[in-house]
UniProtKB/Swiss-Prot annotation:
Enzyme Commission number(s): 4.2.1.20
Protein name (record): Tryptophan synthase alpha chain
SUPFAM superfamilies to which the protein is assigned, alphabetical: Ribulose-phoshate binding barrel
GO cellular component terms attached to this protein's record: cytosol
List of catalytic residues: 52 (proton acceptor), 63 (proton acceptor)
Record family assignment: Belongs to the TrpA family.
Bilayer-spanning residue ranges: none
Provenance organism: Mycobacteroides abscessus (strain ATCC 19977 / DSM 44196 / CCUG 20993 / CIP 104536 / JCM 13569 / NCTC 13031 / TMC 1543 / L948) (Mycobacterium abscessus)
Length: 262
């Protein structure tokens, strides 16, 4: 049995409703801080079970052009790393479940323990760390244990059996399965590597598996929800963000319907 995490009850609730969890990502501070907070609380009302609050970073090597451009806009408009705690608090106050998604450098510069402490105080439940591997995560593992935060590492189709098992063993809450190789972004077709990757995870653990990188419609959400515990949507929501809260809510509701009809 996997060690239960803060997000375990969210996935348990979704399983009880015989559906996958909907996990929505938006970059903090895009297009500006106040608007991003409004958009993320809109995701809660639109049916997202977990909100990923992205920290804008100047070298987003794993992001597609849509998210990279949004991060650039957020940074140009003055968003700071510490602003993420304000956003997480707003999501929590709206009844949502918030995790942070960040490259490791901003957290490292802030101070790993200080970041974890403030995130927990704001109601945050964990951090997704796309460019951090468990072998190099001693400080984060210690801080997450100290402040009761979930650790979400990434696995990919290219992960060796040993790497997969080690990564899953270090996760708490859920594991992020990257369904396509390379950078993220909305695609017309969802990778057929994803079901095989989810099966590999389930061979070694009962931890919840969230699949991301490519979903942009309710139909695609339903496709992934048929075999995954969580459906992660990022670029499509970022694309809707400039159109305002109504557009973001409409897409969230479509996706929420999708994860319920798998």
């Amino acid at each position: 049995m996997t060690q239960p995490g803060r997000l375990t009850e969210v996935f348990d609730k979704c399983r009880a409703e015989e559906r996958a969890a909907l996990i929505g990502y938006l970059p903090n501070g895009y297009p500006d801080l106040d608007t991003s907070i409004e958009l993320m609380t809109t995701l809660v009302r639109g049916g997202c079970d977990i909100i990923e609050v992205g920290i804008a970073y100047s070298d987003p090597m794993m992001d597609g052009p849509m998210i990279a451009a949004a991060a650039e806009t957020a940074l140009a408009n003055g968003v700071r790393v510490a602003d993420v705690f304000t956003t997480v608090r707003a999501i929590t106050d709206a009844g949502g479940h918030a995790v942070v998604m960040s490259y490791w450098n901003p957290v490292l510069r802030y101070g790993v323990d200080a970041f974890a402490r403030e995130l927990a105080a704001a109601g945050g439940l964990g951090i997704i760390t796309p460019d951090l591997i468990p072998d190099e995560a001693d400080d984060w593992i210690a801080a997450s244990d100290a402040h009761d935060l979930d650790r979400i590492f990434l696995v990919a189709p290219s992960s060796t059996p040993e790497r997969l098992e080690r990564t899953i063993g270090a996760c708490r809450g859920f594991v992020y399965a990257a369904s396509t190789m390379g950078v993220t972004g909305a695609r017309d077709a969802v990778s057929n590597a994803a079901p095989a990757l989810v099966s590999r995870v389930r061979e070694v653990s009962d931890i919840a598996v969230g699949v991301g990188l490519g979903v942009r419609s309710g139909a695609q959400a339903a496709e992934i929800a048929a075999y995954a515990d969580g459906v992660i949507v990022g670029s499509a929501l970022v694309a809707a963000a400039p159109q305002g809260p109504a557009a973001v809510r409409s897409l969230a509701e479509e996706l929420a319907t999708g994860v319920r009809r798998a």
